[in-house]
Amino acid sequence: MLTIALPKGALLKDSVAYFQRLGLNFEALLEPANRQLQVLSQDGRARALLVRAQDVPVYVQYGQAQLGIVGYDVLREKNPHVAKLADLGFGQCRLSVAVKASSPYRSARDLPPHCRVASKFVRCADAFFQQLDLPVDIVPLYGSVELGPITGMAEAIVDLVSTGRTLKENGLVEIEQIFSSTAYLIAHPRSYRLNLNGLGHYVPQLTGAIA
């Protein structure tokens, strides 16, 4: 049976809709009362696992899921050993540097050497500032990253931005975009090469369903 890892959160609704176009119905995952972490499609051909977005590539890399949907931001941060099959085009956002609106910094290069930058994207943030040849101290935070500058713990943050509303409501301003991100369809490399669980039958349909 084909197993698909789907991400909790913002990408779930569009991910379910994407597979529904191919006749794989996982709408049960969207029901408010749902507490199941795995569901079968209505025709019994496939199973969906509901996991944290950061864990999708882990399940796919280790073969517990043959397919998954995950944001490009997670792929950049985790660098998993998976096959990237297609950019699905939904879930648009960007990884950006932001500071307090009252600060004098208007680009990442304006930040002082050895300042603190809070982020849950530790690898991406570190790589970005290394490219700038600007030494900074990356402070790992995994919730309410915006509080870093607000409390004075960090001069800046590196975080995902969609509409910018959260930044604005917390007195922060975006000063530089690092990269843009959308949802990607990924596959377990060996399953893809060897057509395990009929994966080769689905992939042309999946990539052809992108609109």
From Swiss-Prot:
Gene3D superfamilies: Periplasmic binding protein-like II. It catalyses: 1-(5-phospho-beta-D-ribosyl)-ATP + diphosphate = 5-phospho-alpha-D-ribose 1-diphosphate + ATP. Catalyzes the condensation of ATP and 5-phosphoribose 1-diphosphate to form N'-(5'-phosphoribosyl)-ATP (PR-ATP). Has a crucial role in the pathway because the rate of histidine biosynthesis seems to be controlled primarily by regulation of HisG enzymatic activity. Coiled coil: none annotated. GO terms for cellular component: cytoplasm. PANTHER family: ATP PHOSPHORIBOSYLTRANSFERASE, ATP PHOSPHORIBOSYLTRANSFERASE ATP-PRTASE. It comes from the Bacteria. This is ATP phosphoribosyltransferase. GO terms for biological process: L-histidine biosynthetic process. Lacks the C-terminal regulatory region which is replaced by HisZ. Pathway: Amino-acid biosynthesis; L-histidine biosynthesis; L-histidine from 5-phospho-alpha-D-ribose 1-diphosphate: step 1/9. It comes from Thermosynechococcus vestitus (strain NIES-2133 / IAM M-273 / BP-1). It is an enzyme of class 2 (transferase). One of its GO terms (molecular function) is ATP phosphoribosyltransferase activity. The gene is hisG. Heteromultimer composed of HisG and HisZ subunits. The keyword Cytoplasm applies. It is found in: Cytoplasm.
